[in-house]
Amino acid sequence: MTQIVFIHGPGAGGCADSYINQLYHYPNSLAPNLPGHLDGAPCSSVERYTEWLRGWLHARGHHQDLVLSGFTLGACVALQYALDYPDEVKALALMTIAMRPKQRRPQDLRFRLEAGDNPETYEKWLGMMDGIMHFIEPDLRARLLQRHREVGPVAQHADLVVIDRFDVRDRIHTLKAPLLLIQGVDDPLATGDYEEEIHRAVPGSKLIKMKDAGHFPMVERPDKFNAALDEFLSEID
């Protein structure tokens, strides 16, 4: 039986709350909070997050027919999982992901660390998080901003460092699971067409460029995202 698992990233609240619309649309789906996101200590690499997720799923009896969907860090974890354990993964639906280190300005990382120490910088960071989520409906946006307050900028810094170390260019050709890529074309944080690179590297993959969506398509345009995932699931069943 197919088990859908949604994996969050450091943005859109930095926790599983960003998948509230999908958890409603797919009643038996799962969306764990990764370590260090509200509780515990963050992991130091995508590989460690992947092993944590696998243990979390196996403890609940989910070890095959997994449909893994994630954005940013969560997308990296999903892709790593599918490469490491291909017999357990049925399909992937990924957003805002690169198969190689992203080009990020050093000051963008320092900004998160400074926000953890300086109240004025912290407020600027919160304002930035609020601005990035401008496509999200107001009530949910406020809820996710509160989650950002709880998770904090230092945890986000750690996640960005982990993302920027992720590199599977030498393994991407071994991917067996059907792959759906969804890219928000109005992403204010985009520094390259990374999804297109993966699409070209994985024969048979599907790339959707979603209008009026930015960094978090699943929460910015939930109806469009859910429809795209529904169609993808119907194609692989």
Task: Name each region found by the language model.
Residues 103-105, 120-173:
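Conserved alpha/beta-hydrolase catalytic His-Asp/Glu region
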Residues 70-74, 78:
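Gly/Ala-rich beta-loop-alpha elbow adjacent to hydrolase catalytic centers
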Residues 41, 210-226:
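Catalytic histidine-centered segment of alpha/beta-hydrolase-like enzymes
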Residues 79, 83-84, 89-120:
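Flexible "cap/lid" loop of the alpha/beta hydrolase fold
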Residues 1-41:
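Conserved HGGG/HGGXW glycine-rich cap/lid loop of the alpha/beta-hydrolase fold
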Residues 175, 181-183, 187:
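Short beta-strand/loop motif that positions the catalytic acidic residue
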Residues 48-65:
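Conserved acidic catalytic loop of the alpha/beta-hydrolase fold
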Residues 188-194:
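Conserved alpha/beta-hydrolase "acid-adjacent" motif
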